[in-house]
Amino acid sequence: MHYFSEKPTTKSDVKIVEDILRGKKLKFKTDSGVFSYGKVDKGTKILVENVVVDKDDDILDLGCGYGVIGIALADEVKSTTMADINRRAIKLAKENIKLNNLDNYDIRVVHSDLYENVKDRKYNKIITNPPIRAGKEVLHRIIEEGKELLKDNGEIWVVIQTKQGAKSLAKYMKDVFGNVETVTIKGGYRVLKSKKL
């Protein structure tokens, strides 16, 4: 049973984790059957610390898990959409918005298989720590279909372990967007960015 399954079958065992992201002390309820259980994932942290957002941005946290990316950025942007196929993750993300006192911000959490249920708007930024184990085809769909949902000059930001195919993903992003930038290389991870021109 993978964290990118719709309904995890593992027994629930909630753990609260605390972390400092972008200078903010945040708390997250995590649970078994959801990605990065019991601690904030290193790749996600590197992505969150390096992504550049603007106060007028509408952002999409794709494959949000229990909500780290969207929650860390929600008070810096205009609107935040968080999407995941995993229903346990969706429930946790909603609870974590409350836990971090973000109820007054424009945040929505959507149960969605990739972009299926979030096509109702366009985004300035799509930010994702993609489910590498779901395979290359899923990764390619994230890039390709993401381009369609970006506003002009919008960007897709992706974190990936160097050893899990970062170079071939960068090449694919360049093929789709005509550009790719390696924003940072740190701790065995790369943060990649492509812009819709």
UniProtKB/Swiss-Prot annotation:
S-adenosyl-L-methionine binds at residues 63-67, 84, 129. The lineage of its organism: Archaea, Methanobacteriati, Methanobacteriota, Methanomada group, Methanococci. It is an enzyme of class 2 (transferase). Belongs to the methyltransferase superfamily. Keywords: Methyltransferase, S-adenosyl-L-methionine, Transferase. Its EC number is 2.1.1.-. Substrate binds at residues 129-132. Pfam families: MTS. Probable methyltransferase that uses S-adenosylmethionine as the methyl donor. Binds neither NAD nor NADP in vitro. It comes from the Archaea. One of its GO terms (molecular function) is rRNA (guanine-N2-)-methyltransferase activity. This is Probable S-adenosylmethionine-dependent methyltransferase MJ0882. One of its GO terms (biological process) is rRNA base methylation. Signal peptide: none annotated.
